[in-house]
Amino acid sequence: MGSDDLSAGDKIQKGFQINYMILRDADTGKVIWQENKDFSAPDVEHEARVPVKILDMRAVSREINFSTIESMENFRLDQKVLFKGRIMEEWFFEMGFVGANTTNTWQSTIEAAPESQMMPAKVLNGNVTIQTSFYDNEILITKSVVRLYYI
């Protein structure tokens, strides 16, 4: 199968890689979690062990560093937070144009749910997955699932 046989999404995915991800306290800028792992691989459920104190933060700043061989007209992602398979929250992020053969850093802020909607870490631990779908406009590039453990 040559590169002409790949769909547009497959072609982008083949040259797409997450280099690292960092979570920071949005108020202080202090790093609370960092992982040098490609969380974009679609065929495996990834795991992330994050400090339990993340649940007490007003907002978290997420930094994704990624590389791409193909250009993207409108790089965006949709994220669903699921508890035991049921959607608790859904977020939409848009970065826009990404040049070919580049490495990029994308930072966005995620605000916590109201305290009245928060569950204790012992209930959430291992039962929360974050499903992230990466797109170029409406073309699905890849979908990844990360299971969260609070330490």
UniProtKB/Swiss-Prot annotation:
Report one GO cellular component.
cytoplasm
Coiled coil ranges (UniProt) are none
UniProtKB keywords: cGMP, Cytoplasm, Nucleus
Any GO BP annotation: sensory perception of light stimulus
What are the subcellular locations of this protein? Answer: Nucleus; Cytoplasm
The UniProt entry, under InterPro entries, shows: Ig_E-set, PDED_dom, PDED_dom_sf, Rhodop-sen_GMP-Pdiesterase_dsu
Q: Which domain of life is it from?
A: Eukaryota
| Annotated signal peptide | none
Q: What is its main location?
A: nucleus
Any Pfam family matching the protein: GMP_PDE_delta
Please state which protein family the record places this protein in.
Belongs to the PDE6D/unc-119 family.
**Subunit composition?**
Interacts with Pde6.
- What is the official name of this protein in its record? Probable cGMP 3',5'-cyclic phosphodiesterase subunit delta
Q: Which organism is it from?
A: Drosophila mojavensis (Fruit fly)
Q: Tell me what gene encodes this.
A: PrBP
